[in-house]
Design a protein with these regions (language model features):
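Positively charged, low-complexity intrinsically disordered regions
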Residues: 13, 25, 61-62, 90, ...
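Ser/Thr-centric signal marking residues that sit
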Residues: 17, 73, 266
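Intrinsically disordered, low-complexity sequence elements enriched in Ser/Thr/Gly/Pro
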Residues: 10, 22, 38, 58-59, ...
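C-terminal motif of bacterial Sec signal peptides marking the signal peptidase cleavage site
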Residues: 5-7
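Asp-box/BNR beta-propeller blade signature and adjacent active/binding-site loops
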Residues: 86-424
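N-terminal low-complexity, Pro/Thr/Ser-rich intrinsically disordered segments
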Residues: 43-109
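Short, low-complexity, disordered segments immediately C-terminal to signal peptides
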Residues: 9-37, 42, 50
C-alpha cells in the first residue's frame, strides 16, 4: 500500500504560496531560536490517498509471566530498581514479522531482545544509537510502572560479539520518575543521553548525561536550568544535525493536558538552546491540533520537515525553509496515527524509513510497521511488519547507519526488542 500526501508549498524565504496538487502514484508498485519568531501560515493540503489497513492483525499471545516466588532477579547497578518479578523469557517461537518487501530493499532482518530476564516490572520508550566501533547503545525507562517514583533510565551496550551488557541505571533524582531517554552523538564522539524528570508530564524538566562509551555516565545535569516550560530539548526522538552544523531537537510539552510541539535549536554543539514558538495547526478549522513527539529530517535542498504524533487519527507534518527557525502550520498526512509514538531516519541516498503503528483512532498500538519513502516523504510504502499481536508494540526508535537500520521498540511493556535490518 502506498500512502501519499502533499507538502505545504513555500518559497526559500519561508512564505507560503499555493497548495500542492495531489500526488500521483503508480498503482503497480503498491504492496498488500528565537522566541520572537512566528511560524508562517499554510494553505490547505491535498488529501489524496488512502489510510486503510490492508489486513487486520492476527491474534497472538505475548510472553507468559509466572507468579513470582521471591525477588530473585538481579537489579541493574546504580540504585534501587523497585519491585521485580521472575517472568518467563520472550517466546521467539511465535511469528512476529510479515515480510512485504516489494522493491527488495531489505536484504536481511534479525531480531534480538536487549534483555530476557526483566530487571524491573515494566519498561518503555527506548532509544538506540549505533557507534562507529560496531557497538550499539540503547536506553529506556523502567520501574514498577510508568510515572512511579522508582522509574529510572536504564542503558545497555551491545558489544561487537552481539551480546547485550547488563543494564546500567542513570538517575538524576532517586525520588522522582524518569521518562523518555534520547541518545545523540556529537561530532567529537561524545554521547549525550537526554531524559525527562518529573512526577507528571506537566512538570517535566530535561536532564542530560554524557559518556564516551555508553557504559560510564557522568552525573546528570539540567539542560536548561530554571526552565519551567514542561521540558526542553528532545522529548522522544533524536535530534538531527543539519548540513551547516546546527542541531535541531524535536520537542513538545503537555502543559494543562495540551499537546504542543516546538524545536530547540543549538548552534554551539548542544551547549545552549533556543526554543522556537509552538508549531501552529488547526483541527476542523478552529481547534488547535494536539501534537507531540515530532521526528525530523533534512532534505537534500536544505529544507527541514517534521512528522508528529496526534490525537486526531493522522500523523501531521510541518516544513521549515530557514533551518528550523520558523515552521508552516502543521497539516494532516494520509498516514494513520493512534496517538502513539513514531520515528524515522534517512539513509545516505535520501530514502526515509518510518516506523509507526498504522492504525487510526481508536486503535491499540499494533501492528508495528516499517515503511519507506523514495520521494522525500511524499509517499510511503510498507515494507515490513514487526509485530501483529493484539498487545502493545510501540514507541519505536530508528537510526540508519550505512546499510543497516537499527530499530528498538516497546514489547508489551515487558521487554525492549531490537532489530538489525540490512538494506540495499
Amino acid at each position: 500500500m502506498i500512502l501519499s500526501f502533499a507538502a505545504c508549498a513555500s518559497d526559500k524565504s519561508g512564505s507560503d504560496t499555493t497548495a500542492a496538487s495531489d500526488i500521483k502514484t503508480d498503482a503497480a508498485t503498491a504492496p498488500a531560536a528565537d522566541d520572537s519568531t512566528t511560524a508562517p501560515e499554510t494553505t490547505e493540503p491535498a488529501t489524496s490517498g488512502t489510510d486503510a489497513v490492508s489486513a487486520a492483525p492476527s491474534v497472538r499471545r505475548g510472553p507468559t509471566k509466572t507468579t513470582p516466588a521471591a525477588d530473585t532477579t538481579k537489579p541493574a547497578s546504580g540504585g534501587n530498581s523497585g519491585s521485580t518479578t521472575v517472568p518467563s523469557k520472550p517466546d521467539d517461537s511465535k511469528p512476529s514479522a510479515v515480510e512485504t518487501n516489494p522493491k527488495k530493499i531489505i536484504v536481511s532482518a534479525e531480531k534480538e531482545w536487549i534483555f530476557t530476564e526483566k530487571p524491573t516490572d515494566s519498561c518503555h520508550a527506548s532509544t538506540v544509537l549505533p557507534l562507529d566501533n560496531g557497538t550499539v547503545v540503547a536506553a529506556w525507562f523502567a520501574g514498577s510502572s510508568e510515572s512511579d517514583d522508582d522509574v529510572k533510565i536504564l542503558t545497555s551496550v551491545r558489544g561487537t560479539d552481539g551480546k547485550w551488557g547488563e543494564p546500567i541505571r542513570v538517575s538524576a533524582d532517586p525520588n522522582v520518575a524518569h521518562w523518555n531517554p534520547v541518545l545523540f552523538q556529537n561530532d567529537d564522539g561524545t554521547i549525550t543521553l537526554y531524559f525527562k524528570v518529573g512526577k507528571d508530564t506537566e512538570y517535566w524538566k530535561t536532564y542530560y548525561s554524557v559518556s564516551t562509551d555508553g557504559k560510564n555516565w557522568a552525573a546528570p545535569r539540567e539542560l536548561v536550568p530554571g526552565d519551567n516550560s514542561g521540558g526542553r530539548g528532545p522529548v522522544k526522538n533524536k535530534p538531527i544535525r543539519l548540513k551547516n552544523g546546527t542541531i535541531l531537537a524535536p520537542g513538545s510539552t503537555e502543559l494543562g493536558g495540551k499537546y504542543r510541539c516546538f524545536v530547540d535549536i543549538s548552534t554551539d554543539n548542544g551547549k545552549t538552546w533556543n526554543r522556537t514558538p509552538e508549531i501552529n495547526s488547526t483541527f476542523l478549522g478552529f481547534f488547535k491540533t494536539p501534537m507531540i513527539q515530532p521526528t525530523l529530517w533534512e532534505s537534500k535542498d536544505g529544507s527541514v520537515h517534521m512528522f508528529t504524533r496526534t490525537k486526531v487519527g493522522k500523523i501531521y507534518r510541518s516544513d521549515s525553509y530557514d533551518g528550523g527557525k520558523t515552521w508552516c502550520s502543521a497539516y494532516p498526512t494520509n498516514l494513520p496515527n493512534n496517538n502513539s509514538g513514531i520515528d524515522l531516519d534517512t539513509d545516505d541516498s535520501g530514502r526515509i524509513f518510518l516506523v509507526y503503528n498504522p492504525v487510526g483512532i481508536p486503535g491499540i498500538r499494533t501492528p508495528l510497521t516499517l515503511a519507506v519513502s523514495l520521494d522525500d516523504g511524499k509517499t510511503f510504502t510498507k515494507i515490513k511488519t514487526f509485530e501483529t499481536g493484539l498487545a502493545e508494540y510501540s514507541y519505536p526508535a530508528v537510526v540508519v547507519k550505512g546499510d543497516i537500520i537499527h530499530i528498538t521498540y516497546t514489547y508489551e511493556r515487558d521487554y525492549i526488542a531490537y532489530w538489525q535490518i540490512k538494506i540495499k
